[in-house]
């Protein structure tokens, strides 16, 4: 049986909340407190408008037309050269290795096609999954494409967002194969569901490191 694992990145393989804290510190050092506040205001406005984090769009809205070229480059470098590898969760790499023994592993993430790809590549995760990666603004709207790109007898979805798991489950028929889901209680979305096993997912775990022991 061919099992394809679809794994999210932010707060699933990589501690995005902790990375944002460090990014905020670096932004403040570069821009000052006032302009950093303007950046995060633009960040949330862009996310509300498009339903996805878009760093290039956020940067464009943060810097006014008089911002120097040096400042623009420094801000872009802050994100494009950030050490995301340092924020990979303990046990995440071992989980990927375990899943690859069962079948193909695909990174399936939301985000803009520039920054999100850079984040995943710089973290080293792309190499671990042999370059198999799909990035969409809203991945739950692309099950037909996912199924066509990675046909399988069965799918395993691992994500930290309850809403993503619910939407994948509701549209599972589009994958042309049954789907098993794992909710990982990491990051800010962990508080969205009550403590204990969540009935919306096949499995609920506290850490990405728990996957090998749970699946055996």
Describe each PLM feature range:
Residues 13, 105, 157:
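Conserved SAM-binding loop
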Residues 57, 80-106, 140:
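Short, acidic loop-to-helix structural element flanking the phosphoryl-transfer center
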Residues 1-2, 121-216:
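Asp-based, Mg2+/Mn2+-dependent phosphohydrolase catalytic module
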Residues 19, 30-33, 43-81:
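A metal-dependent, Asp-based hydrolase signature
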Residues 6-8, 108, 157-158:
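Generic enzyme active-site microenvironment
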Residues 1-41, 64:
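Active-site neighborhood of HAD-like aspartate-dependent phosphohydrolases
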Residues 93-106, 110-134:
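Substrate-recognition/cap helix-loop segment adjacent to the acidic, metal-dependent catalytic center
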Residues 12, 19, 113-114, 163, ...:
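Conserved Rossmann-like nucleotide-cofactor binding loop
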